[in-house]
Amino acid sequence: MAIPSYKVRLETNEPITPNVRKLVFRLEDPKTITYKQGQFVSFMLGTEDGRPIKRSYSIANMETDGVDSTYIEFVISYVEGGKASELFFNAEPGKEMEMTGPFGLLCLTEELPKRVFLVGTGTGVAPYRSMIEQMRTRTDTEFHILFGAQYLEDMFYLDDFKAVALLDHVHFHPCLSREEKPGCFSGYVQHKLAELNPNPETDIAYLCGNPNMVDEVFEMLKDKDFGVKQVKREKYVFSRF
């Protein structure tokens, strides 16, 4: 089966932290894409030496469903010397690119347990933003969103996460590892998760972002007798090429 391919045009490219930009691409051909919240898309990028490279980014659209969407929003961190981040950070609106997808299984399942932990660092919270409208309606499940960053200025989409956390069954835990701020947990996301006492009998966890965080939290959950199917993982690897 052929992988769906799309021609897209950059609509907006704006900084949302000192090191992260938000990009919105409009679908040109075909005009729409169907995806599941939590999935990602890939871009084929041409480089100066003519060798194409592929980079993947989680869909951050915040919609009631992912059917027939006319745009794709994602966030990207700057990697010094990274060809992909240089290209995207400097891309001007109107730039045309080729996109494939959607891919990935980091999606909420039809049946959910008592508690769901959504753990992310940096741009690894993008798929959780796309799940916000699902969280609103799945009132039988208690959601805990854990967002890890070094400093408060490194965080984004805060208004969206705080808004959904006004609901009784949704909780937002911003975690800062390098500074103390009111309303934020001081420490790493794995430390906050441990405080919440995850239980394999009633909970599942989603992990996305820094590979070291993903591995450390996965080991912690395994020590608590979580099975592989109870922990969904997606690592973000930052490449300079």
Protein language model features and the residues they cover:
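Ferredoxin-reductase
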Residues: A2-P93
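A short, basic/flexible loop-to-alpha-helix module at the beginning of a structural domain
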Residues: G101-L112
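Ser/Thr-glycine-rich phosphate-binding loops at phosphate-binding pockets of nucleotides
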Residues: T121-V125
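Conserved S-adenosyl-L-methionine
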Residues: P113, R136-F143
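Reductase modules of NAD(P)H-dependent flavoproteins
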Residues: A2-K7, E142, L146-F241
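Histidine-anchored nucleotide/phosphate-binding helix
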Residues: P127-R136
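Conserved beta-strand elements of the Class I
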Residues: F117-V119, Y206
